[in-house]
Each structure stands twice: as structure tokens, then as C-alpha cells.
Design a protein with these regions (language model features):
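Conserved N-terminal diphosphate/IPP-binding helix and adjacent helical/loop segment
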Residues: 1-80, 129-148, 155, 159-160
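Active-site alpha-helical segments that house and flank conserved acidic catalytic motifs
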Residues: 42-61, 65-81, 87-117, 180-203
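A mid-sequence, solvent-exposed acidic-amphipathic segment
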Residues: 151-155, 159-195
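Active/binding-pocket-proximal capping segment
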Residues: 201-202, 207-212
Length: 216
């Protein structure tokens, strides 16, 4: 369901592209350093957007550097890391884990079960670090799953539930920006859900999987 919030490369300036890539690579390195390769493969462009947004808003002290990786073994890539990349890495792993749990319970995807087992020990610490967010995300994913099982056809209701999950991710701190960030996360989450439903509708109909647009 993720991967829709990406940069428009043909329209972006070189310096802005370099800035974007540095935060993307920074989040990638953060995931690897905190959670190993199992965390690193959960990297998404959507969470990179969250990093850039929150970094621009809060302006935390940002560490700049460069590094090589498997994807770029020869040329070093610019990297930016800060407290926002740490938070985003945590949220990325937390959300990935509980989404895998739901995929296993709903569709019995063996790959989802295996991945959730790998992340399980790491997520226990995150549950303690972010108890309110963890409970909220679990509850909302469970509600989303139940509505899918019941064949809910109100796409706005379904999208709204996913929007509430994203608003939890966007609300980094309880401060003057919280309400605005929650609202932004909510509507962006709805947008992501709607795009995903539209993209998958033909395949879901063919495979007899749930999709709120399947009977339109």
C-alpha cells in the first residue's frame, strides 16, 4: 500500500534531488544501524517524505556525511541523519510489523509471517518506547481488517481508517504543530488508500480479493 509518495524527478532541481536522496539514504542507513538488513528492506519513499517534512518543520541538528552501500558500491552517496530519521525508522518498522501480522491473519501469507517473526523482538522495544502510538496503530489495523472481512463497500470509511493510521505517524510530538500534522497525515493516508484500491482493483477482482471498488 506504500510507495505512492515519490518525487517528480523531471521537475526537480539537481540540488533538491541531492537533498532528497541524502534523506532517503539517511533513513536507509538509520534502519540498517538500528534494525539490521531486516529493517532496511522495509524502507519506503512515503516515510522519506515524512522525514523531509518533519525535518523542514522542526529543523533538528542534522548530521551530514557520505557512505557506500550494496546499491552504490563505488560512488559514495550523501547522507543526512537526525532525530527525525530515528523516529521515522522506528515508525517504519512498527507499521511494517503489524501490517505483516494482519496479512498473515487475513490472507495467510507465509512471507508476511516470516518477516513479522524476524521483526518481532525489535518491535517489543518499540511497543514500550511508543505505547500510545503502538496501541493506536494496532487498533486501527484491526478495524481495517474487520471491515475488509465484512466486505465494507464505503470506500471513504475504509480510506478514513487508513488515514487515521498515517496521522499517528505524522504527529511526532504533542505541540503546536500536532493538529495540523495529524490533519495532513489523515488526508494523505486517505489518498494513498484510494490510489492503492484503484491500482489493485482488476487484480483483486481476478483473484477474488477484497477491494472497496470491486463493485463500482
Amino acid at each position: 500500500m506504500f510507495g505512492y509518495i515519490v518525487m517528480n524527478k523531471p521537475e526537480i532541481k539537481f540540488k533538491d534531488f541531492d537533498l532528497y536522496r541524502s534523506f532517503y539514504c539517511g533513513l536507509c542507513r538509520e534502519l540498517k544501524s538500528k534494525y539490521g538488513i531486516s529493517g532496511q528492506i522495509s524502507l519506503t519513499y512515503d516515510m522519506t517524505f515524512v522525514v523531509i517534512l518533519l525535518s523542514a518543520l522542526y529543523e533538528p541538528r542534522t548530521q551530514k556525511g557520505s557512505t557506500r552501500c550494496i546499491i552504490h558500491p563505488v560512488c559514495k552517496q550523501p547522507v543526512r541523519r537526525n532525530t527525525v530519521t530515528e523516529y521515522a525508522a522506528d515508525m517504519n518498522v512498527l507499521l511494517t510489523y503489524y501490517k505483516c501480522r494482519d496479512d498473515w491473519e487475513d490472507e495467510k501469507k507465509v512471507t508476511a509471517l516470516g518477516y513479522s517473526k524476524v521483526l518481532q523482538g525489535k518491535v517489543k522495544k518499540l511497543d514500550q518506547k511508543y505505547p500510545d502510538k503502538s496501541r493506536r496503530i494496532q487498533k486501527l489495523l484491526s478495524e481495517l481488517s474487520e471491515m475488509e472481512k465484512s466486505g465494507e463497500k464505503d470506500i471513504d470509511k475504509m480510506a478514513g481508517c487508513f488515514g487515521k493510521i498515517m496521522e499517528e505517524i505524522f504527529a511526532w510530538k504533542q505541540d503546536v504543530w500536532e493538529d495540523t500534522l495529524r490533519r495532513m497525515g489523515f488526508f494523505l493516508g486517505k489518498f494513498i488508500y484510494l490510489l492503492d484500491a484503484y491500482d489493485d482493483v482488476e487484480e483483486d477482482i481476478k483473484n477474488k480479493n477484497y477491494n472497496p471498488r470491486s463493485e463500482e
